[in-house]
């Protein structure tokens, strides 16, 4: 068994040309399987069956191995058996149909409402960068936008009169979102300054030279605001998570939050229900802590 394992690793190195890091990880995983086989007196790769491999996976899971690590181990086993089958040394694959135990999904990091208001209610200096960055922060939180969605926004997608923004999301799906009062005010402060930079295209958020801000530039501005106002690391998706969590906590309307976020599967939205946690515009108007829009169409 050791010879065949060594031959497979040599095949990965010379023919598949996998990286040293990947090769080391695969060998380490397969050595675990080999050690298990020796303890269970499984004397050849042909004798390892699905029940035996399932027993190993269960044992490793109980010892604290993550689902991700176990998935990699199963991938290594499948690769080994694909090689053994191709070489005529085996006729089955014990990993076929096996999946690692499901791990707990990591919960999104959010700001609570007080911390969010602390971030957004800080004093704004009267200059180009300050007004632009404030508009970016307010729009992220007001609409729960993805970084890619905000980066790609053009001026003609914004309707301040009606308080709406058209967003092009994942899968070429378009959704129209309400823009809260605070975000509208910040945008109204920003747009005259934007015009002074003479942007050559319709980008909503631009540099002082009129060029569209890229994702990295926006990430850095959000990070700087987090460090300045909150003394913590902040990234755009944390504002999206906070938007979703705060709305869901107040409204308990999972479907509305799903549509506002642009999630195709409600299971993706359900991750926010951990925060203890009317349609769309009504939920937005009544629940969002910074989006109370005046009646009568301000």
From Swiss-Prot:
Where the record annotates domain Core-binding (CB), the positions are 1-85
Cross-referenced Pfam families: Phage_int_SAM_1 (PF02899), Phage_integrase (PF00589)
Compartments, as annotated in UniProt? Cytoplasm
Describe the location of the Tyr recombinase domain by residue ranges.
106-285
A GO molecular function assigned to this protein is: DNA binding
Q: Name one GO biological process term.
A: chromosome segregation
Family membership, please give it. Belongs to the 'phage' integrase family. XerC subfamily.
What PANTHER family does the record tag this protein with? PHAGE INTEGRASE-RELATED, TYROSINE RECOMBINASE XERC
Its quaternary organisation is: Forms a cyclic heterotetrameric complex composed of two molecules of XerC and two molecules of XerD.
State the protein's name. Answer: Tyrosine recombinase XerC
- Species assigned in the record: Pseudomonas fluorescens (strain ATCC BAA-477 / NRRL B-23932 / Pf-5)
């Amino acid at each position: 068994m050791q010879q065949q394992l060594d031959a497979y690793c040599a095949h990965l190195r010379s023919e598949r040309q996998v990286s040293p890091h990947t090769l080391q990880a695969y060998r380490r995983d397969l050595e675990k399987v080999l050690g298990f086989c020796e303890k269970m007196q499984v004397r050849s790769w042909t004798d390892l069956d699905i029940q035996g491999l399932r027993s190993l996976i269960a044992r490793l899971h109980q010892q604290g191995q993550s689902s991700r690590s176990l998935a990699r181990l199963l991938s290594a086993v499948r690769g080994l058996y694909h090689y053994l089958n191709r070489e005529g040394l085996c006729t089955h694959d014990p990993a076929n149909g096996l999946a690692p135990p499901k791990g707990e999904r990591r919960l999104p990091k959010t700001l609570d409402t007080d911390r969010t208001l602390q971030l957004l209610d800080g004093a704004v200096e009267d200059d180009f960068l300050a007004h632009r960055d404030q508009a970016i922060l307010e729009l992220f939180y007001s609409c729960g936008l993805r970084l890619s969605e905000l980066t790609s926004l053009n001026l003609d997608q914004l309707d301040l009169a009606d308080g709406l923004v058209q967003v092009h999301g994942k899968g070429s799906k378009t959704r129209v979102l309400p823009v809260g009062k605070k975000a509208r005010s910040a945008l109204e402060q920003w747009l005259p300054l934007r015009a002074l930079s003479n942007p050559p295209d319709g980008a909503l958020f631009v540099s002082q030279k009129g060029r569209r801000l890229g994702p990295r530039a926006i990430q850095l501005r959000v990070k700087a605001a987090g460090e300045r106002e909150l003394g913590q690391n902040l990234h755009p998706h944390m504002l999206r998570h906070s938007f979703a969590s705060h709305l869901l906590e107040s409204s308990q309307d999972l479907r509305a939050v799903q549509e506002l976020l642009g999630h195709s599967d409600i299971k993706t939205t359900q991750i926010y229900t951990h925060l203890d946690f009317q349609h769309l515009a009504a939920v937005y108007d009544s629940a969002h802590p910074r989006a109370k829009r005046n009646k009568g169409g301000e």
